[in-house]
Amino acid sequence: MVVRRSSRQGPGGNIVDPGTNPHPQGGDALPPSPILMRMKGDSLLAPFGMLGRSALDTAAQIGRWGGLASDTIRAIPRVGIWGRLLLGQMARIGVDSVPIALFIATFTGVVMALQASYTFTGAVPLYFVGTLVGKTMVLELGPVLTGLALSGRVGANIAAELGTMRVTEQIDALETLAYDPVAYLVVPRILAGILMFPIVVILATSVGVAAGWLTSLQLLDMSTAEFMKGLRLFFEPWDVQFAIIKSLSFGLTVTSIGCFFGFTTEGGAEGVGISTTRAVVVSSMVILVLDAFWAATLL
């Protein structure tokens, strides 16, 4: 038996198959697919989901860092574990960092003197070069540039060293032997950073000011008396105390963040590289935030 499909006439006299809609537009249009609508909604909400996950991850990291900080404070009385390691860490974190800090401070002082001379030409007495070099190096550039440089050197070194110990299960071995890994690995590094960062900053700042003075003598036709006049003009002892406070906080920041990312490393060699990068980036960001915080609260 043959089934004959009937056809009907659409607009304009055209023959239209009965399975099709002769009016594809207008009120008879098919509703949008729920799947497509869901996909479109998901694409619009995706940035908010990523933001939420990032916020949760950040909060979790801060919580884990707080746990390590609490363990570190409880481990400080165990001097018998970390006491003999402190001097070695002070040498690695402080003494070995002096060359790069002095190198940065030297050229910073030279540039500051030249830029101050260029800015003050014909408008301000030239001895204000000493004022600008001294104030800027002591209050800002000395501590901050040194802190950023040491975050790359010290923070990366700590994160890489502890991260390697974590992925090779050396830290787990210390726990198995009833050794407190926090007292053995974290406390001496953090205390060394707190003690040595101010010393390195003072040396770097002094060299930066001296470099500005020599630049003024050789290139700006200034005398030592003129430079010293400007240097003493607005100098206050509080400036040095302010720089020391900042450097103390920078030392704590760089070493504690390096220890945290090293201790939480996972994923083998790739994880060590990721932890090292994160330690440098996060400590540099926190240094800049602390710089603004101390300026807003203490100046």
Place the predicted regions along the sequence by residue:
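Active-site cofactor/substrate anionic-group-binding motifs, chiefly glycine-
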Residues: 91-145
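Short, positively charged and aromatic/hydrophobic N-terminal segments
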Residues: 14, 20, 24-27, 31-35
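Hydrophobic alpha-helical transmembrane segments of multi-pass membrane transport proteins
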Residues: 129-172, 200, 257
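Selective transmembrane-helix segments that form parts of the transport pathway or gating/packing helices
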Residues: 94, 98, 102, 141, ...
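Short cytoplasmic-facing helical segments at TM-TM junctions of multi-pass membrane proteins
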Residues: 162-187, 269-272
